[in-house]
Structure formats: C-alpha cells, structure tokens
Amino acid sequence: MTVNTPANPDILALGEAMIEFNQSAKGEPKYLQGFGGDTSNFCIAAARQGARTGFVSAVGADHFGRLLIDLWERENVDTAQVRVDPQASTGVYFVSHGPDGHAFDYLRAGSAASRYAPHDLPLDAIAAAKVIHLSGISLAISLSACDAALEAIAHARANGVRVSFDTNLRLKLWPLNRARAVMLEAIRQTDICLPSWDDVTELTGLTGRDEIVDFLLSHGPRVVALKLGKDGSYIATPDERRVVPGHVVNAVDATGAGDCFGGAFIARLVEGDDPFEAARYANVAAALSTQGYGAVAPVPSRAAVEEILAG
C-alpha cells in the first residue's frame, strides 16, 4: 500500500518510525501516545520548514502502522516508499523522565522496519532526490537494514545525491566496536555529518571540539554540524568553522531535538542557505521543539522559527 505521492521529494530519509509513549511528568504513571523514530522525526521537521520530504521504510499491517501513515499524510511527507509488511509489527518505545534526564525503552525486535532489505530500496526515488538522510539507528536495527542503508548511500553518491548522516549512537542496539566500524564506513561516504557531542566523543574517543571535527572532515564529509544542545552547534567546513550560539528557552523535554535540528538544517541547505545560516535557523527550531513533550508534536513551523529570527 502506498499513499500520499506529491512531486518527487527533495529530501528522503531512510530508517525506522515508531509509536512513542512519553511519560507525562517525572514519577507519573501516565504516558502520552505520540510518534518517534529519528529519521521520521527528521522528515517531519524538514517538512514543517517547507521542504518536500519523503520517508523510506516499512511499517506493520497494524493499527500503529496506520497511525504513522496518517501522521505522514497530515505532515505532507511523501509515503510512496513506505511498505506495509503484513508479517511484522510496528515498533514501539517508551520515554521516562528522571533526575538524570530522559531514558528510552524499546519494543522493536522483528519490527517491519528491521526486516527492510536492499531489494526493498526505491532506487529511482533515491536517484531523483537532492539529499538522502540516514542515521546510526538506520544502520543498527538489523543486518538487512544496515545493508540496505549502505546500499542506499552508495546509490545516492553514484547519482550525485548528497548524503546526510546523523550518528545517533544507541548502544542498546549494537556493541560499540561494531558501531564504530560501520558508522565510519558510512561517514566516509557522507557529505553532511550531524553528530551530537555525546555520540561523537563515545565513537571517536576524542574530547576536543576541533580534533573531533578534524577527524570527521578527514573521513570525507564537507560539512560537519556538531550539535551542542542548549549551547548551539559547532559548524565546520574545510575552509571555516565557528560556534553558532543556541536559542535560550525554558525546555521541558529534549526528546527529538537533535532530529529537529537535522531536519531544519538540511531543509535550509536545500533552500540555499550556507551551513552557518542553516545552523542559526536550526538552532532556533531545535530549541523551540523542547518546549513541549514528545518528538513530533512540539516541532515548530517555519513561521514560528522565522518570527524568532526576525525579533
């Protein structure tokens, strides 16, 4: 089943979408149903900034899969490349809030997205895009999904399509040594790398901002956007690097903020911004997304971001 097929998307994202249950407050037994999955969050964030986006994945032939497809339809995300797998379920995860921040628990083994394989890839759609976005989770959820992600990257590069990669390291999904090896293989074929501070220090063993971006740039990317949370982002190209300050808000939940940054950043690059302009915009979008609960509901519109930037 395929639905919602506007003009060819400029931005495609490949990965797993999930149903989210987010604790309503610290210590509370109530969980609010929402939506997640890093690359899906990314797609929605980019779409809310006005970009033409599409998602490449699989969902189960179940109620949760239908909810996700309905979500993408509402968000103007192209679902032409979303498969419905009648033999698998849609993944679910829980977000709990405590004194040390938020914690995640996943029910995703054998999910429809984890069964995705190279033969499922929409090669023509990938070749027609301007950017394809993947993450460490795209690579980690299963061996077949990893093979599909790496093949998608190779096909994109062979057709002049830029590759965007967010590290999103999840050690519950795979051991650190394998994560390092596979992610470095992906980064070598990446044009735009979007690591978080915690991920990249764990992956590289480095702790200096400049040595981290030197390491990443030496492996292939032309743009590194190192996410620094409330402090903004450190943007580096082979010719220039600088901190782009964050936007200060009263944050209540940072779930998905990095995905929001990535979607907004890539949307602005596709529209013609340079990396530093794109980061200024994306920092505001990510900050605004922390003012509500969940990975999707608080993602701001383009109008909301532009209002802050204009002020």
Residue ranges and their predicted role:
Residues 10, 52, 162, 192, ...:
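Proline-centered loop/turn at the N-terminus of a beta-strand
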Residues 52-136, 307-311:
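Conserved N-terminal subdomain of the carbohydrate kinase-like
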